Amino acid sequence: MTRVIIDGDACPVVDSVIELTTGTGIFVTILRSFSHYSNKVLPNHVETIYIDDGPDAVDYKIVKLATPEDIVITQDYGLASLLLSKVKIVMHHKGHLYRSSNIDMLLQQRYNNAQIRKQGGRHKGPPPFSKEDKKQFERAFKSVIKQL
């Protein structure tokens, strides 16, 4: 059975995923650190798992829980690289799919930016998440779940 696992601490498309999976038989598991705790009532097909705060604690739990039938949504390139051979699909919250053909470039870019910061330099970060980004994600996610 397909499940969507969301790296939920900073994911701007949680509500979209919940809405688009309602009535499909697809379950959603949101993993968050306790510092992002919420009392929000969620539909029955959605489970939230809270993880102790700590560097990469949520990422490690996602790797541990993920199965070959899962779809994982994350903006973390390192986590995505660990999951590519483990799950069905790894998606970014802007809608693009992580693949073995693009992950090395993304990781190299992340490394280069870290080196610039380490030397006291600055680099341009990503633009703020927009309504168009949300629409693009929803189109891509609909396409993914349609193919299941």
From Swiss-Prot:
One Pfam family named in its UniProt record: DUF188
Superkingdom: Bacteria
InterPro entries per UniProt: UPF0178 (IPR003791)
Family stated for the protein in its record: Belongs to the UPF0178 family.
Stated name of the protein: UPF0178 protein SH2212
Annotated organism of origin: Staphylococcus haemolyticus (strain JCSC1435)
